C-alpha cells in the first residue's frame, strides 16, 4: 500500500511543536484533516482549510461557503483526494480554527510504496498540544506565563480553565491507538481533479 511520510509543525511555535507521521494514500482532504487533528491532538470541532500557495489553491470543508472569496481556486475537501498533490508538492499549509487560526506547515518528506498498515502512525513528536480555544499560538504562550506566575491576577481563573477542560499530555501510544481505530474509507476523486490541476 502506498503512503506518505509527513511532518506537521505549528507556525511560530518556539520551540517548534511538531509531529512526524505516515498516512495511507487514497484519502480525501476531509479525511486528511481528521488525521492531522488526531496527530496533533486537536479536538477537531473547528473549520479547516488547506492552502497550496504556488498553485493559488485552497481546499476547504464546504466549497459553497467560500464561493467568490479571494482569487484562489477553491476545491471541496470531501471531493478531492490527496494523492496528486502529495506526489507533486513539497509542502502545504493546514489551518485549523479560523478564530484562533492555528497555521501548520506540513512537509511531505517521502512517498512510501510498500506501507503495511491501513491506518496512520505517528513516528516522533516534539511539544505538547496547545490548549484548544486559547486564542492562538501567541495567546498560548501568554497563558503559559500566567500559569507559571501565582501572583498574576488571572492565574487562578486560567488555572481552573485549563484544568477543568483542556489539560492533556501528548501520549504517543494513545494517539496511535486512536489513529488505528479510524475507519478511513478511500475515496475516488473527480477525474478533473487528478487530470487537470497540473495540466499546465
Q: Where do the PLM segments sit?
A:
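Short linear regulatory motifs enriched in tryptophan with gly/pro/ser
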Residues: 1-200
Amino acid at each position: 500500500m502506498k503512503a506518505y511520510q509527513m511532518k506537521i509543525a505549528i507556525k511560530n511555535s518556539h520551540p517548534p511543536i511538531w509531529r512526524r507521521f505516515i498516512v495511507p494514500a487514497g484519502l480525501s482532504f476531509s479525511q486528511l484533516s481528521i488525521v492531522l487533528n488526531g496527530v496533533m491532538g486537536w479536538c477537531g470541532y473547528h473549520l479547516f482549510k488547506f492552502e497550496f500557495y504556488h498553485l493559488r489553491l485552497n481546499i476547504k470543508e464546504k466549497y459553497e461557503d467560500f464561493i467568490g472569496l479571494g482569487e484562489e481556486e477553491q476545491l471541496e475537501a470531501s471531493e478531492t483526494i490527496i494523492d496528486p498533490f502529495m506526489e507533486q508538492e513539497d509542502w502545504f499549509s493546514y489551518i485549523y480554527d479560523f478564530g484562533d487560526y492555528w497555521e501548520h506547515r506540513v512537509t511531505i518528506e517521502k512517498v512510501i510504496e510498500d506501507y503495511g498498515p491501513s491506518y496512520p502512525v505517528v513516528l516522533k513528536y516534539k511539544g505538547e498540544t496547545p490548549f484548544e480555544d486559547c486564542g492562538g499560538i501567541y495567546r498560548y504562550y501568554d497563558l503559559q506565563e500566567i500559569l507559571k506566575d501565582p501572583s498574576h491576577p488571572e492565574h487562578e481563573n486560567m488555572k481552573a480553565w485549563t484544568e477543568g477542560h483542556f489539560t492533556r499530555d501528548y501520549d504517543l501510544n494513545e494517539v496511535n491507538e486512536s489513529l488505528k481505530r479510524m475507519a478511513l474509507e478511500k475515496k475516488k476523486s473527480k477525474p478533473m481533479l487528478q487530470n487537470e490541476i497540473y495540466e499546465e
